[in-house]
């Protein structure tokens, strides 16, 4: 490990400790975030501050979520739908969230609306040796050919939970999604119990919009 790698490892450890101090204490999630090198998922300009608790632009009007948000959503999923299992991510973006899910032991499928981001992240996953299945498409419609899923995580905001995603949940599966208006959404978890869905409401966040047939136009 060279000096740069050691420096990044220290920054990663400090990021994890900061998340713990903010109340995110699931050790499996924190361990995954300690292992996955976030600086590889941002551009060179942002890499020096990759372990600060901030979101960064990744192009095409999209962002890599701040570490707190990643840890928060991952904890909601993990505590209700522990690995191993089949998880669908909506909004591949930088690929960081999918890599965290992969590190936890899930079989990860991810849908990205923007072809350029998809192509970039597929190359990154290949270089990192990550076996994550990706496709370009309307994330609000899910990935019907691979359904059902044990878990679904939506990393963009929707005005309501897309019916297509609910239909692609397996029994006892859970879906984590920010739902609300353009400027503010409430993190919401749906769990499938037979033919009905139970709903839990959590903290408020601000995400980029989910664009698609069952999202924002």
Curated annotation (Swiss-Prot):
One of its GO terms (biological process) is protein repair. The active site is at 65. The keyword Nuclease does not apply. It catalyses: [protein]-L-isoaspartate + S-adenosyl-L-methionine = [protein]-L-isoaspartate alpha-methyl ester + S-adenosyl-L-homocysteine. It is found in: Cytoplasm. Its EC number is 2.1.1.77. Its main location: cytoplasm. It comes from the Bacteria. Coiled coil: none annotated. One of its GO terms (molecular function) is protein-L-isoaspartate (D-aspartate) O-methyltransferase activity. InterPro entries: PCMT (IPR000682), SAM-dependent_MTases_sf (IPR029063). It is an enzyme of class 2 (transferase). Catalyzes the methyl esterification of L-isoaspartyl residues in peptides and proteins that result from spontaneous decomposition of normal L-aspartyl and L-asparaginyl residues. It plays a role in the repair and/or degradation of damaged proteins. Belongs to the methyltransferase superfamily. L-isoaspartyl/D-aspartyl protein methyltransferase family. This is Protein-L-isoaspartate O-methyltransferase. It comes from Chlorobium limicola (strain DSM 245 / NBRC 103803 / 6330). The gene is pcm.
């Amino acid at each position: 490990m060279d000096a740069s790698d050691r420096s990044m490892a220290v920054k990663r450890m400090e990021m994890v400790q900061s998340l713990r101090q903010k109340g995110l204490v699931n050790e499996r999630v924190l361990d995954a975030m300690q292992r996955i090198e976030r600086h590889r998922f941002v551009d060179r300009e942002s890499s020096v501050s990759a372990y600060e608790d901030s979101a960064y632009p990744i192009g095409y009007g999209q962002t890599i979520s701040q570490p707190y948000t990643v840890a928060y959503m991952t904890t909601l999923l993990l505590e209700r739908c522990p690995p191993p299992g089949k998880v669908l991510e909506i909004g591949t973006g930088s690929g960081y969230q999918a890599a965290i899910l992969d590190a936890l032991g899930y079989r990860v499928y991810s849908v990205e609306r923007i072809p350029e981001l998809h192509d970039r992240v597929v190359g990154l996953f290949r270089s990192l040796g990550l076996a994550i299945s990706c496709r370009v498409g309307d994330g609000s419609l899910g990935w019907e050919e691979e359904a059902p899923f044990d878990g679904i995580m939506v990393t963009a905001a929707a005005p309501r939970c897309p019916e297509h995603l609910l239909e692609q949940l397996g029994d006892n599966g859970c879906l984590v999604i920010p739902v609300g208006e353009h400027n503010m959404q409430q993190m919401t978890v749906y769990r499938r119990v037979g033919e009905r869905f139970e709903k839990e409401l959590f903290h408020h966040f601000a995400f980029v919009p989910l664009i698609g047939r069952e999202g924002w136009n």
